[in-house]
Curated annotation (Swiss-Prot):
Record-linked InterPro entries: Aldolase_TIM, Elp3/MiaA/NifB-like_rSAM, LIAS_N, Lipoyl_synth, rSAM
The family this protein is said to belong to: Belongs to the radical SAM superfamily. Lipoyl synthase family.
Cofactor note: Binds 2 [4Fe-4S] clusters per subunit. One cluster is coordinated with 3 cysteines and an exchangeable S-adenosyl-L-methionine.
Organism: Kluyveromyces lactis (strain ATCC 8585 / CBS 2359 / DSM 70799 / NBRC 1267 / NRRL Y-1140 / WM37)
Residue stretches making up the Radical SAM core domain: 118-339
Lineage, top ranks: Eukaryota, Fungi, Dikarya, Ascomycota, Saccharomycotina
Name of protein: Lipoyl synthase, mitochondrial
Binding-site residues, [4Fe-4S] cluster 2: C135, C139, C142
Alphabetized SMART domains for the sequence: Elp3
Catalytic activities: [[Fe-S] cluster scaffold protein carrying a second [4Fe-4S](2+) cluster] + N(6)-octanoyl-L-lysyl-[protein] + 2 oxidized [2Fe-2S]-[ferredoxin] + 2 S-adenosyl-L-methionine + 4 H(+) = [[Fe-S] cluster scaffold protein] + N(6)-[(R)-dihydrolipoyl]-L-lysyl-[protein] + 4 Fe(3+) + 2 hydrogen sulfide + 2 5'-deoxyadenosine + 2 L-methionine + 2 reduced [2Fe-2S]-[ferredoxin]
Main location per the UniProt record: mitochondrion
Misc. remarks from the entry: This protein may be expected to contain an N-terminal transit peptide but none has been predicted.
Residues holding [4Fe-4S] cluster 1: C104, C109, C115, S350
Length: 370
């Protein structure tokens, strides 16, 4: 026989069980997922049965993300000779000896043979990459190494960079950096110091810096603009609609526009410059709007080049744009009032043809002031 206390507990347990079993169960609906949304937008089972699935088209972002069959072989206009020549090997040895990094090597630029191997040393161009060879961001088009916490900046780098450039006897040099979101100033003071040391060792050298967005900190943009450089470059990379897919989430289209605008307002005589890749799935209307946005903030120079997939881990090419189309965009840029436009399948933001033109413009301005 059960004790009174145990009988009471047993009775309460049975009662609660009966109540729970008679109450209607409330089903909890799962939150709609991104995967479900994609399924709902796509063809149904009935569409597949009826053969209508092909009628569903992808928007530009989906096309850029999923394209795999349309583009296979590299067109003839994108094939380049193997890099060689005495100047090429001299620059390569100097870079290695002074423990410098170049975007030419790290980003696997197809123009390295042309830029480094010119017959005239004064026309050779190397884009020095400062603050190490490891970026804190992970853009889907870029082959530069990434890490959340790269090694600390090398304090001797500004001096070594200035020494290398003075050895090469260049008339024009480009400095660029990886993004360093781990640093409070984004590396702005390190880059500014490098510009100043170059100007001390070789006052006649024209200096272009291709910098990041400093997380939108416009005070750091001003530090760079006031460092003594001649050309302030910051790349838009792509059109606004594709920016979230192509670039790291910390880089935005409007933020990049604000960087170029701030640099121009800080030092109005600065030449401001940007670069846009084509072949990512952009439309003509989007490219034209990007150029209009850039002219609205006073950007002087723009370059267009073909996106080329560095490795299979990176986003795929949607389209190989023809040389004729690049000529079309150059004409449009000049019509909109850009000071200069370099546009071609192999053109990159630091392409030497553009630098030669800008060098002549800047030196012409200098002579006019004397």
């Amino acid at each position: 026989m059960l004790k009174p206390g145990i009988r009471s507990v047993q009775k309460r347990f049975i009662t609660e069980t009966v109540v729970r079993s008679t109450q209607p169960s409330v089903s909890r609906r799962r939150k709609t997922t991104h995967f479900t949304d994609k399924l709902n937008k796509g063809p149904s089972f009935e569409d597949f049965v009826n053969g209508n699935a092909q009628k569903f088209t992808l928007d530009p972002l989906e096309k850029a993300r999923q394209n795999s069959e349309e583009v296979q072989r590299l067109p003839t206009w994108l094939k380049v000779p193997i890099a060689k020549g005495s100047n090429f090997h001299k620059l390569k040895n100097d870079v290695k000896e002074l423990k410098l990094s170049t975007v030419c090597e790290e980003a696997k630029c197809p123009n390295i043979g042309e830029c480094w191997g010119g017959g005239d040393k004064s026309k050779a161009t190397a884009t020095i990459m400062l603050l190490g060879d490891t970026c804190t961001r992970g853009c889907r088009f870029c082959s530069v190494k990434t890490n959340r916490k790269p090694s600390a900046p090398d304090p001797t780098e500004p001096e070594n960079t200035a020494e290398a450039i003075s050895r090469w006897g260049l008339g024009y040099v480009v400095l660029t950096t990886v993004d360093r979101d781990d640093l409070v100033d984004g590396g702005a003071y390190h880059l500014a110091e490098t510009v100043q040391k170059i100007k001390q060792k070789a006052p006649n050298i024209l200096v272009e810096t291709l910098s990041g967005d400093f997380r939108g900190d416009l005070e750091m943009v001003k530090v760079m603009a006031l460092s003594g450089l001649d050309v302030y470059a910051h790349n838009m990379e792509t059109v606004e609609a594709l920016t979230p897919h192509v670039r790291d989430r910390r880089a935005t289209y409007r933020q990049s526009l604000s960087v170029l605008e701030c640099a121009k307002k800080t030092v109005p005589t600065l030449v401001t410059k940007t670069s846009v890749m084509l072949g990512l799935g952009e439309t003509d209307e989007q490219v034209l709007q990007t150029m209009k946005d850039l002219r609205a903030i006073g950007c002087d120079v723009i370059t267009f080049g073909q996106y080329m997939r560095p490795t299979k881990r990176h986003m795929k090419v949607v389209e190989y744009v023809t040389p004729e189309k690049f000529d079309y965009w150059k004409q449009k840029a000049l019509e909109l009032g850009f000071l200069y436009c370099a546009s071609g399948p192999l053109v990159r933001s630091s392409y030497k043809a553009g630098e030669s033109f800008i060098e002549n413009v800047l030196r012409g301005r200098s002579r006019a002031r004397i």
